[in-house]
């Protein structure tokens, strides 16, 4: 089987596993144990892909955000009716900056940030990572700053793009604290952040509460495809249960 051959070579190349499921895998349940065992055996570090605002807390990550971030969800009974498109990417959700309409005009700049600290309750290998990957699209240019341990590490501009785009940053050792800062007059859409090692196994924990597993056919294929090509997964695990059972009304 090709996947197991890739696992054998994982210490020299990344192997990505995307674990989708319903609420039974929330909080990194199952994914976390599987990640720890495979990373210990075949190499790898980091918690993998997660949204700016997770639906529930995960032991594998330790992040916080400024209060002006909002989450837009595209699965189960939680679909945001204010969104007039289905471009949700691989996590079936995205996050954006909520602007104050009373203060905003075409020249107003708004700021938001994401703080990521080393998790203190995760498995050991989740606490080490040397790569940060940001998946986004932007209607206007966005000033982006990355602070490591309260010192500016990188300043850049996220280009205007309708497609989901990857911003990648590498560092020599795991920072105790990272702060991602965004400044723009139009919010970017952030589809996910990934923390990874140089090589080895990456396992993404993607819980979709209330989902039946049919969501793959309900979102925009182009958006999903763009992000999946950037992620380049080697294996999908689909773990859906009771939400797939049709409701039957007795007469």
Q: What is each residue range found by the language model?
A:
Residues 1-19:
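Membrane/wall-proximal cationic-aromatic binding patches
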Residues 15-16, 25-27:
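N-terminal, post-signal-peptide region of Sec/Tat-exported proteins
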Residues 22:
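Extended, alpha-helix-rich binding/interface surfaces that flank or overlap catalytic cores
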Residues 26-147, 157-251:
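Conserved SGNH/GDSL esterase-like catalytic core that processes O-acyl groups on lipids
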